[in-house]
Swiss-Prot record:
The keyword Mitochondrion does not apply. It is found in: Cytoplasm. This is Nonsense-mediated decay protein 4. It comes from Kluyveromyces lactis (strain ATCC 8585 / CBS 2359 / DSM 70799 / NBRC 1267 / NRRL Y-1140 / WM37) (Yeast). Involved in nonsense-mediated decay of mRNAs containing premature stop codons.
Amino acid sequence: MILNFIIDSSSFEKGLGNIAIWSKLNDPKLTINAYLPLFTIQELDFQRFKRKSVVAKRALHFIDLLQDSTSFKLHLEYPELNEAISWNETVKLCQQNSHTSLSQHQISVIPIRFKKLLKSCYYKCHYKSHDLDEDIDHTNEKSDPDDKGWVLVTEDDTVRSLATQFQIPFISVVEADAIINACIKDKSYVVNEKFSKTVIKKANKVKEQEDGKKVFVTDFKNDFLAPRAKSGELWTPTSAKNKS
């Protein structure tokens, strides 16, 4: 199974732990191509230096030290490639293939940093199907049979809105994680999926920590236990066994 993910900065800020787990997978049946657009690195740099984000700093350090594993392949977008992709051509193609057209005002108010991301995503998701990469792609990616079916992984609502307008498929980190676990048939995922959904359903409060992780809070009277395997002996302390 081949999974092609375009990962933006918000995914690293809110799902760094998940991505770290993906990078350590060594399942020969699974290949995760992780494409980091120029936008991702620049946005993490901004969060680190301008807003003193500890999570962004950790994310950049993680990317610097990241090495390919059996299942995880990292692909970085270079500035030259992003500059070579025409924004006007991207908008033109989007207008041609969309049932709803964007107004000139809607296009003009898009911040430059998001234009960079949209160019990267549209290039990976749509350009190649239109054979427009011949003058753009100098990395010979066109010959790669795995280079198709790209999906944007994002936690940013603004990015999701723009992705919808530009016909760029997107999913959340949690959804990407579920897809990966389903591909490798992780037993812990299968066993705990129903329990996790029940926790989220019964939670009356959600707290988000600095590292992006979410804590679901439930009432004491509604507390319940995780499912235990039907077979097996219940563990008891050694001291209790000796007394009996």
